A protein has these predicted regions:
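Active-site-adjacent loop/helix segments that line or gate small-molecule/cofactor pockets in enzymes
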Residues: 1-20, 68
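Glycine-rich loop-to-alpha-helix module at the N-terminal edge of alpha/beta enzyme cores
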Residues: 3, 31-116
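Residue-level signal for pocket-adjacent positions within structured domains
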Residues: 4-11, 34-39, 57, 64, ...
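Active-site and channel-lining beta-strand-loop segments
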Residues: 13-34
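Short secondary-structure boundary/capping elements
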Residues: 16, 47, 73, 158-161
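Short beta-strand-to-turn element immediately C-terminal to the catalytic PLP-Schiff-base lysine
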Residues: 25-26, 44-45, 137-138
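PLP-dependent aspartate aminotransferase-fold enzymes
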Residues: 80-169
Length: 169
């Protein structure tokens, strides 16, 4: 397929036109079980009526505004999440990589407030944290990092599911 989209993933030779519940349909009408959409991206399925209605309602009011302003639905959701999770604050992000970047920054900021100017973040082998510079550094796989140096410092890796590896760190 001739495309102007960067080749950042090994794409399969199929083009989807629409989805219904757990099913995707290609441009030839062939149906596929969607088991690869992304983690919690479409966890209620494609075109779920309640999700579609909520998106339509919000789109009719306001699509987007800067976080420099208060957004009523955002405040309502934050309140509900904090109530459920017994937390004081939430951080909304668009992707797992952005959430992990925020976690890295918050951990480093906390360390700085505690007087640690060179904090170390431990992650595990076999993990995946995203495709930003910090998150590929957090990912132990060298293959993910090749060609993107210099990478941020302060990450070490333990062997997943190996308590002795963690103790040695």
């Amino acid at each position: 397929m001739n495309t102007h989209v960067m080749n950042t993933y090994q794409r399969l030779p199929v083009t989807f036109s629409h989805g219904e519940g757990v099913w995707l349909f290609d441009t030839d009408g062939k149906r596929y079980l969607d088991a690869l959409c992304g983690i919690s991206v479409t966890n209620l399925g494609h075109t779920h009526p309640a999700v579609s209605a909520a998106i339509k309602t919000q789109a009719d009011l306001l699509l987007h505004t800067s976080n420099l302003y208060h957004i009523t639905p955002q405040q309502q959701l934050a309140h509900k999440l904090c109530s459920i999770a017994a937390m004081d604050k939430v951080f909304f992000s668009n992707s797992g990589a952005e959430a992990n970047e925020a976690a890295i920054k918050l951990a480093r900021l906390h360390a700085s407030h505690k007087g640690n100017s060179h904090p170390i973040i431990i992650t595990m082998t076999g993990s995946f944290h995203g495709r930003t510079l910090a998150t590929i550094t957090a990912t132990a796989s060298q293959k993910m990092k090749t060609g993107f140096g210099p990478l941020p410092a302060g990450f070490i890796y333990g062997e997943y599911n190996n308590i002795n590896s963690a103790k040695q760190l």
